[in-house]
């Protein structure tokens, strides 16, 4: 959000108050989420829209010029992964759409060697393997069952 001063009718009296304004800045992650959800809400007003958070990020190396650090490092923008997760949750509240928090609910935590059962291992602790996808799918299945499919 940004804030601006605006004149509004409050109980029959025109008063100046601070107003929150949703960001639609395409140069920001939050702005792009808001642009997308604004368009989806307009184009599909009767459909259930669901947001998902990413899962935890383990390390990955796919060559000298494609090395992905773990989530405990900031990205090139200076943000940690949890800042993006909070932005997704904020958008969920702004746009009245549910969010399935796979970051918390999936149980996949590739930061520990013992979690190798859910990732390819070796140089790729970022992507789920077949067991990881099954666990993620099960999480999504049970969460989606709690949501209305018709309105």
What positions do the PLM features span?
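Alpha-helical cap/lid subdomain in secreted, periplasmic
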Residues: 1-151
């Amino acid at each position: 959000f940004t804030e601006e001063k605006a004149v509004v009718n409050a109980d029959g009296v025109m008063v100046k108050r601070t107003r929150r304004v949703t960001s639609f800045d395409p140069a920001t992650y939050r702005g792009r989420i808001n642009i997308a959800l604004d368009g989806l809400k307009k184009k599909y007003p009767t459909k259930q829209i669901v947001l998902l958070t990413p899962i935890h990020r383990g390390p990955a190396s796919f060559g000298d010029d494609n090395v992905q650090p773990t989530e405990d490092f900031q990205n090139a923008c200076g943000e940690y992964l949890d800042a993006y997760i909070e932005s997704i949750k904020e958008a969920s509240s702004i746009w009245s759409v549910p969010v399935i928090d796979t970051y918390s609910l999936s149980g996949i935590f590739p930061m520990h060697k013992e979690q190798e059962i859910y990732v390819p291992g070796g140089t790729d602790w970022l992507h789920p393997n077949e067991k990881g996808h099954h666990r993620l799918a099960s999480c999504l299945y049970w969460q989606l069952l709690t949501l209305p499919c018709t309105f």
